[in-house]
Design a protein with these regions (language model features):
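Structured secondary-structure scaffolds
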Residues: 1-197
Length: 197
């Protein structure tokens, strides 16, 4: 992880302190530890190796790879198999990952480590001889959480401010204003109906 730690330190001037602090803090406090990339599950992407039945890839190992693999598949489906390189091997390309605080480490440290670790074999196969390194995230402007009346917003518990319902009662401009002034940029915030009204 020394390369990832350096990568994070190099972004201190323009990444949010919370993103740098959480990612770099985890690396510095825990050190470089092996992480399992499989789970014993009956759902998910099965490990395609005989004898590994019942093992699936850990969602955060394979999910971030989806950014790259989806772009490669898109290029192939659209008849220009090399088109993905315009983003993934172009030093001018800038990838931004807008996420919530619970996914910071995976996008700010884990994913860059995977990209750094792909190595020459991948690049020779996909990008060609002497291919450019893969594009690392330019910024990960992660937000903290916005709660509702001091409770975690949850779709499965039907606890939230639903846009369609909101717009039947109120104009969108007050919503835009309230979300702007209460945005959880550096700390968790709370939607409070009394404050909104």
């Amino acid at each position: 992880m020394p390369n990832v730690a350096r990568y994070l330190r190099d972004r201190k001037s323009y990444w949010r302190d919370t993103v740098i602090g959480q990612s770099l803090g985890q690396i510095e406090s825990e050190g470089l530890k092996p992480r399992a990339i499989t789970r014993d599950l009956d759902w998910g992407i099965p490990v395609p190796i005989q004898g590994w039945e019942g093992k699936c890839l850990y969602v955060w190992f394979e999910a971030v790879i989806g950014y790259l693999s989806a772009t490669i598949e898109w290029a192939q489906v659209n008849g220009d198999a090399a088109a993905w390189k315009e983003w993934w091997t172009n030093p001018q390309a800038k990838a931004f990952h807008f996420i919530g605080k619970d996914n910071i480490f995976f996008h700010a440290a884990w994913w860059p480590a995977q990209l750094m670790g792909t190595g020459a074999q991948f690049l020779e196969i996909y990008a060609g001889e002497g291919g450019q390194p893969l594009t690392l995230p330019y910024d990960v402007p992660a937000n903290m959480f916005m709660n509702l009346e001091n409770r975690k917003i949850s779709g499965s518990h039907n606890w939230g401010v639903w846009g369609r319902d909101f717009l039947t009662r109120y104009d969108p401009d007050p919503l835009r204003y309230y979300l702007t002034v209460t945005m959880p940029e550096n700390r968790d915030t709370d939607w409070n109906w009394d404050d909104f009204l």
